[in-house]
Design a protein with these regions (language model features):
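Rossmann-fold dehydrogenase core element
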Residues: 131-144, 165, 169
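A structured beta-alpha segment of the ubiquitous adenosine-cofactor-binding alpha/beta core
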Residues: 17, 22-89, 93-98
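Short, ordered loop/turn segments at secondary-structure junctions
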Residues: 93-94, 112, 119-120, 144-145
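Rossmann-fold NAD(P)-binding glycine/threonine-rich loop
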Residues: 94-106, 118-137
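NAD(P)-dependent Rossmann-like dehydrogenase/reductase catalytic/cofactor-binding core
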Residues: 261-317
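Single conserved hydrophobic/aromatic residue that forms the stacking wall/gate
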Residues: 1-19
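Active-site-lining helix/loop region of Rossmann-like oxidoreductase modules
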Residues: 148-280, 284
Length: 317
């Protein structure tokens, strides 16, 4: 996180990549494989990256690219309490099932609100939702949407087909990128929940089942020279009036990390609102607006309106 003027401040960050830990966050931002576009000068704030638990967070392609830190692991709960962290954001590599749940439990033990940006089902899992409800701590999740990304545009176009009376027969979404997220996703065994999350996010906007063979959505390949850019190729094939074929195909080009950052900041703000209001459990409206796999799926228009009502205090969650 960047230190900002609106009250969002850096706290301790945990990490496992190559650079020697602890390291100042402002230096870690450009270390090793971090290759996004620079859009701001970030002053040194004294915030350091500390050595967290790895568990299943370090996949095959990470091991081939960077060395895991040899620094001793910190007591995550103790560090969260010492830094007086109010909201913990989970932004681990795709496939970090065990690690994501470890940090979710750390949030509960440290008394933090939790924002789950990963396609690991926590907010949308009843057992975990009940844990946060019992602890009186809010959670926003699961699996962050980008500001304008492949999933949000694909959802809207699928819904547009249905709203305009065009029967969607089949669709695909192919994504390529050059950051470590895409390199990590070459390990297909880590993608099960990611594919489920992205697919269900799109198909949830339809009131009929396309069938598994007619939907293909997921990361496709790693192209190193793209750096932090992501290119998405989306196609929708349908039938309009008189069963006449109607097809739509488009390409989306974005810088992946900033496209996500603007959304995660608002998710953090909503989590803090929930914490201030002493709301425990999943925040349904912000989760549906900011996440691909929320506990409850609304249309994007409904989710936006409900989130505004939540912020204004007109809706509990």
């Amino acid at each position: 996180f960047f230190q900002a003027e609106d009250g969002i401040r850096d706290r301790d960050v945990t990490g496992v990549q190559t650079c020697a830990l602890p390291i100042y966050l402002v230096d870690a931002m450009w270390a090793s494989e971090n290759n996004t576009i620079k859009f701001a000068d970030v002053p040194k704030s004294g915030v350091t990256v500390l050595r967290g638990k790895t568990l299943d967070g370090f996949g095959k392609y990470y091991k081939q690219t960077v060395k895991e830190s040899t620094a001793p692991e910190v007591d995550v709960v103790a560090e969260l309490k010492a830094a007086k962290v109010e909201v913990l954001i989970c932004y681990l590599p795709v496939g970090s099932e065990e690690a994501a749940k470890f940090y979710a439990q750390c949030a509960i033990d440290a008394g933090c609100a939790f924002v789950n940006a990963l396609p690991v089902f926590i907010a949308s899992d009843k057992e975990w939702a009940d844990k946060f409800t019992k602890a009186g701590l809010p959670i926003v999740g699961d699996d962050i949407k980008s500001q304008v990304g492949a999933t949000i545009t694909h959802r809207i176009m699928a819904k547009l087909f249905q709203d305009r009376g065009v029967h969607l027969d089949r669709t695909y979404q192919l994504n390529v990128g050059g950051n470590m997220d895409f390199k990590n996703m070459l390990e297909r065994d880590r993608l099960e929940s990611k594919k489920i999350s992205k697919t269900n996010s799109v198909t949830s906007q339809l009131d009929y089942d396309l069938g598994d063979k007619n939907v293909h959505i997921g990361p496709s390949d790693y192209i190193q020279w793209l750096d932090d850019r992501k290119w998405a190729y989306v196609r929708l094939e349908g039938r309009a009036f008189g069963d006449v074929p109607l097809n739509l195909e488009y390409k989306l080009e974005v810088w992946d990390s900033p496209n996500s950052a603007g959304v995660i900041i608002d998710a953090l703000r909503c989590a803090k609102i929930g914490l201030d209001r002493k709301i425990g459990g999943p925040l349904l409206s912000p989760s549906s607006y900011f996440m691909k796999t929320p506990p409850v799926q609304y249309t994007d228009e409904q989710a936006h309106d409900k989130t505004e009502e939540f912020i204004a205090g007109k809706l509990e969650r």
